[in-house]
């Protein structure tokens, strides 16, 4: 059985979306955001105090992962019959790995600075210049997505893959920051295609329902203010 520790619309949405695409059963453990401050007992499971935490199996063969893009790759690779993986022998394998890593290191990281210094920090610690600079930084890097989907429905391999889930979360985060209108036209159309996927919609519904059932606020993590 898979166990996913998750905050609403945090990075842990990536593996949740993947699980819905793969139609895999999972126990979803909802946490308030940020868990390292509001769910201190979680530190016993993940000393980083961050989500996601994905756990599968039991010791000594237990799988424990804390990186969301790596989870996308792992879930796709361990369920190749679903067609979300790209094999090492495929010509698009390099592009596939590049998009998986770019999704967090290049497209999500700058947005975390925008969130921290524009929303999460108290007013006296907010940094408007950081917000402005890293918003521009993100939008400049998003040109790579615009180029990739200008003449293709998805990022690589001529089909929907785990890379689209990983990058799709970065676009979801940008939506929470009000940046969608600054996407290029191809990226806007691509983002709409991703949102239209039934698994994406199921993931949104699953986190909302689980939050309510477990007594956690359903407010998306990127929208939280101090």
Task: Describe these PLM feature segments.
Residues 207-226:
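Acidic/histidine-enriched, glycine/proline-rich intrinsically disordered or flexible terminal extensions
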Residues 1-129:
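GST-like domain detector, emphasizing the conserved glutathione-binding G-site
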Residues 76, 170-171, 204:
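Active-site-flanking alpha-helical
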Residues 70, 186, 199:
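Residue-level recognition of oxygen-bearing side chains
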Residues 33-34, 160, 209-210:
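Positions that flank functional sites
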Residues 100-196:
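GST-like fold's C-terminal all-alpha helical module
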Residues 38, 193, 213-214:
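Short Asp/Glu-rich motifs
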């Amino acid at each position: 059985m898979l166990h996913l520790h998750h905050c609403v619309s945090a990075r842990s949405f990536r593996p949740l979306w993947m699980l819905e695409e793969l139609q895999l059963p999972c126990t979803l453990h909802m946490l308030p955001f940020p868990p390292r401050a509001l769910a201190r007992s979680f530190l016993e499971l993940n000393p980083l105090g961050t989500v996601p935490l994905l756990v599968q199996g039991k010791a000594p063969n237990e799988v424990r992962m804390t990186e969301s893009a790596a989870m996308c790759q792992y879930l796709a690779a361990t369920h190749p019959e679903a067609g979300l993986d790209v094999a090492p022998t495929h010509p698009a394998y390099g592009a596939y790995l590049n998009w998986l890593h770019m999704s967090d290191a290049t497209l999500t990281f700058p947005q975390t600075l925008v969130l921290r210094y524009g929303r999460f920090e108290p007013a006296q610690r907010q940094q408007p210049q950081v917000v402005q600079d890293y918003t521009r930084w993100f939008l400049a890097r998003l040109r790579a997505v615009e180029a990739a989907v200008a003449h293709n429905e998805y990022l690589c391999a001529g089909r929907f893959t785990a890379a689209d889930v990983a990058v799709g979360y970065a676009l979801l985060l940008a939506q929470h920051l009000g940046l969608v209108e600054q996407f290029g036209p191809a990226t806007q159309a691509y983002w709409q295609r991703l949102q239209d996927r039934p698994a994406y919609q199921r993931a949104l519904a699953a986190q909302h329902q689980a939050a309510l059932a477990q007594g956690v606020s359903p407010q998306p993590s990127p929208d939280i203010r101090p």
